[in-house]
């Protein structure tokens, strides 16, 4: 805390990390709020014709946020270069995922016609392979 070389001189946390020169737009403390930010970046990539891809990582709790559903709809409509990665640890705040969602989380994207795949997040090679297939 308070280190001159730390994030925000040691007075900030990971939600303040950003480096736009590297395409890192930052994070924030609001559940799921990085998802539409990533869509905005994906739309910008399309408009600019850069060939870039926007990626957002979020937890399973964000799957219950309306902003995720809005983002899925817009991303599908506009065929945006967006990769969404849900890190499902089986808990959404204080509730087990099984008591919060009626269906498999990876199937939600199917309602919007978006390619999706569920993989074991503890298998780094399976995650890398799935990500490669998603952006191919």
Predicted stretch roles:
Residues 1-78, 99-102, 106, 110-113:
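Cofactor-binding active-site loop characterized by glycine-rich and histidine/acidic residues
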Residues 82-136:
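Thiamine diphosphate
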């Amino acid at each position: 805390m308070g280190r001159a070389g730390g994030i925000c001189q040691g007075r900030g946390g990971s939600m303040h990390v950003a480096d736009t020169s590297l395409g890192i737009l930052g994070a924030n403390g609001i559940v799921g709020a990085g998802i539409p930010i990533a869509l905005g970046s994906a739309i910008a990539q399309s408009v600019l014709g850069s060939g870039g891809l926007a990626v957002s990582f979020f937890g399973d709790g964000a799957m219950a946020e309306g902003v995720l559903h809005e983002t899925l709809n817009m991303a599908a409509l506009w065929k945006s270069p967006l990769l969404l990665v849900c890190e499902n640890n089986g808990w959404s705040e204080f509730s087990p995922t099984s008591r919060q969602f009626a269906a498999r989380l990876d199937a939600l994207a199917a309602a919007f016609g978006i390619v999706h795949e569920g993989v074991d997040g503890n298998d780094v090679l399976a995650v890398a392979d799935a990500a490669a297939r998603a952006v191919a």
